[in-house]
Amino acid sequence: MADQRMDISSTISDFMSPGATDLLSSPLGTSGMDCNRKRKGSSTDYQESMDTDKDDPHGRLEYTEHQGRIKNAREAHSQIEKRRRDKMNSFIDELASLVPTCNAMSRKLDKLTVLRMAVQHMKTLRGATNPYTEANYKPTFLSDDELKHLILRAADGFLFVVGCDRGKILFVSESVFKILNYSQNDLIGQSLFDYLHPKDIAKVKEQLSSSDTAPRERLIDAKTGLPVKTDITPGPSRLCSGARRSFFCRMKCNRPSVKVEDKDFPSTCSKKKADRKSFCTIHSTGYLKSWPPTKMGLDEDNEPDNEGCNLSCLVAIGRLHSHVVPQPVNGEIRVKSMEYVSRHAIDGKFVFVDQRATAILAYLPQELLGTSCYEYFHQDDIGHLAECHRQVLQTREKITTNCYKFKIKDGSFITLRSRWFSFMNPWTKEVEYIVSTNTVVLANVLEGGDPTFPQLTASPHSMDSMLPSGEGGPKRTHPTVPGIPGGTRAGAGKIGRMIAEEVMEIHRIRGSSPSSCGSSPLNITSTPPPDASSPGGKKILNGGTPDIPSSGLPPGQAQENPGYPYSDSSSILGENPHIGIDMIDNDQGSSSPSNDEAAMAVIMSLLEADAGLGGPVDFSDLPWPL
């Protein structure tokens, strides 16, 4: 046992000896020792370098400069980014002000919304929301030749294609011979500017400008500065609104040469006229279109400008514009007549006047508003115009007046002719106003007559009888002297009010009396007027109700009444001056509610029509109590 213990202790001591320890730790611990050594060395070196930099003033300065450069670079970058953001914001704001949809918004929009609305607006302008390509314009069942013949036949012209860069005629249809007398072979390949009038070349060049079409994008090499040839496949041609063209130009006509002698052109002016006749005016309508050079067969032009760009051409239809100049009759030039529009109330007062009236009448619109048109009519034309006034209130048709004289601001008269029509409120069924289109009639039209305006038959009655002798005086005609005030009737503004009250009374009676529903406004009933000796007739006539002549009353039926203050026998109620009293006298025995209502309507209308213009109305002799 002791020997075994000694062997074990010797073995352990051998194992724990330094040599054995090196043998065990050599394969495993060598790398770890080296790593620790490296770590210690690296950290030591860094610390030493830091201590050296701190101790060395030169190293400390370099370190400070390095940190300053980093800080300055960061600040410069932030300033650049800030300026870029400011520019972008300013452009976004400017774009928002140019787009109508953005400008109409009350709140400020974000950048994405502004850009989206700008894109939508550009698509709307260029027609890109619903693009029209070549295939959309041609039906599938028509070939190209058939479509070309149909277009030429419908347009009655010739089709031509012109290059926008040089004005070279690339194609022209055979129908050009009918208009310009040039064959197709004579024009193809020639310059369009050689056949234009010298004064029209600049205008045609402006129309050939392709700035509105798709931009010609080119890639430029930064080193050489030359354009780079790209293989970009062009998309389908789009007919945008900016590519449309329509213009007039003068082109040469190849008319057959005629031998002209010198005596035929005695002056330079005649030669200029002959040269002018060799041109004809052509109306060209078409659009600008872009083709790749390979499609046009222009690859032989190996110019650097043609690389990577499309060829813009004008495709148009040329039609002969005929000069239609009417020949003057009797050496006079017919011009459009001057006219103005006015709107009147039912009593003839101005409620609206067109601004063109100032150049014709010399009145400002505010000077005419609220005044009656009868104040400006000549006294000889009041009767005819009153009849037209009554007719336009009773019918829905347009009434054309005869030529009449209208007093302008300087006191003289101008000749007018008017078309009147009334506007009826669809809800109340009442006339609200009268629209009058007034046309100036020249002296030559008055002498020769104008078939477009039929003349109406003038009334045999004079409107002098419509006003009392105290206001307008007895009937007499004053000679009209241009430039001197006169010719109008004092107090004529009441005539329109009297006509309006007459028509309103007619409609009121028609609405209240069942027996008169089917009668005409101009002839309420066929009952003859009562005799002037009857009590009712005397009292009503003495009431002084204004009287207006009716256009439908024949002259033979007019009865003079000395007790009536006016010379005409027509009443404010129409042809029958006392329709209400006569109807009541015939039905005295019956007291139906309809008759009572009709009687009260007549009484109320007489009270309203009187309006303080005449004397008091005496109803003491009426056959029934009030």
From Swiss-Prot:
Q: Where on the chain is Phosphothreonine found, per UniProt? A: 21
The PAC domain covers 401-444
GO terms, molecular function: DNA-binding transcription factor activity, RNA polymerase II-specific; E-box binding; protein dimerization activity; RNA polymerase II cis-regulatory region sequence-specific DNA binding; sequence-specific DNA binding; transcription cis-regulatory region binding
Q: Where is the motif named Nuclear export signal 1 mapped on this chain? A: 142-152
- For bias type Low complexity, the affected ranges are 511-521
Q: Which UniProt keywords apply?
A: Acetylation, Activator, Biological rhythms, Cytoplasm, DNA-binding, Isopeptide bond, Nucleus, Phosphoprotein, Repeat, Transcription, Transcription regulation, Ubl conjugation
PROSITE patterns reported in the protein's UniProt record? BHLH, PAS
Write down what this protein is called.
Basic helix-loop-helix ARNT-like protein 1
What is the species listed in this Swiss-Prot or TrEMBL entry? Equus caballus (Horse)
Designated gene of the protein: BMAL1
